[in-house]
Amino acid sequence: NKKTGRPVYNAIVWQSRQSQEICDTLIERGLNDLFKKKTGLIINPYFSASKIKWIFDHVKTVQDDANKGDILFGTIDTYLLWKLTNGKVHATDYSNASRTLIYNIHTLEWDDELLKFFNIPKSILPKVLPSSHIYGFATALSSIDMGFNTIPIASLIGDQQSALFGQCCFDEGCTKSTYGTGCFILMNTKDRIIYSNKGLLTTIAWGLDGKVEYALEGSVFVSGSAIQWLRDGMEMFKNSSDCEKAIRGENPSGGIY
């Protein structure tokens, strides 16, 4: 809520499938190709748009407050930026915007046609800026004795895109792989928007020096989280490192594969 600063609902994690029905309805209408062409993504609860619609559909007062201009949306970077600047800056970068399923990666704008499918008002969306940019200053920290009054907030970028940048994958074809909760492979395609017919996503890598670069991404949602489930849910071992013993054991898959 723009006036109170309080979230209108709990943050919805990327793994959540609670908006699956919303996505299924759009897929049944044959809209997957349209969304892929404009956003590089597939219709999936993984992305923000269906989560936003779910909140509008299920949380009382949100629609009325949005009509009054009192509702703001943001991925976690936008929310943290807004909090750190004491509500002065409502923005995101190209890489995070490209993961919402409502951002056109060709025109670099929130897409009016896609917004209508989710009944999302454009007024709630953040301004999209380069990944390297002075967004504002962390005035919320000015009351803390840190030796200076304000800290400049000079960058926003998505997590996997930041890993691509951090691994210095600046050339076309350079690829990185990250293993964590899930597994994610990203390949820099520079200024080329490349569509895959093998299930890869097309996304914005970052926006720097007045231009946008793109990437291809392969996503596996469950990897490290499977180890955590085996440890905490199935109680097959006490420490995550113990899973290696089971993996290296004789016929660990029981002939399944």
Regions of interest found by a model, annotated:
Residues 10, 19-24:
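A short, polar/charged loop-to-alpha-helix boundary motif
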Residues 1-12, 37, 126-127, 144-155:
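N-terminal glycine/serine-rich phosphate-binding loop of ATP-dependent small-molecule kinases
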Residues 20, 27-90, 101-112, 116-117, ...:
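Active-site core segments that coordinate phosphate-bearing ligands/cofactors
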Residues 16:
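Carbohydrate-associated surface elements
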Residues 130-134:
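Gly/charged, well-structured mid-domain segments that form the phosphate/adenylate-handling core
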Residues 2, 135-139:
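Active-site neighborhoods of enzyme catalytic cores
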Residues 121-125:
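A conserved beta-strand/loop element that lines the FAD pocket in flavoprotein oxidoreductases
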Residues 8-9, 95-102:
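Glycine-rich phosphate-binding loop of ATP-grasp-fold ATP-dependent ligases
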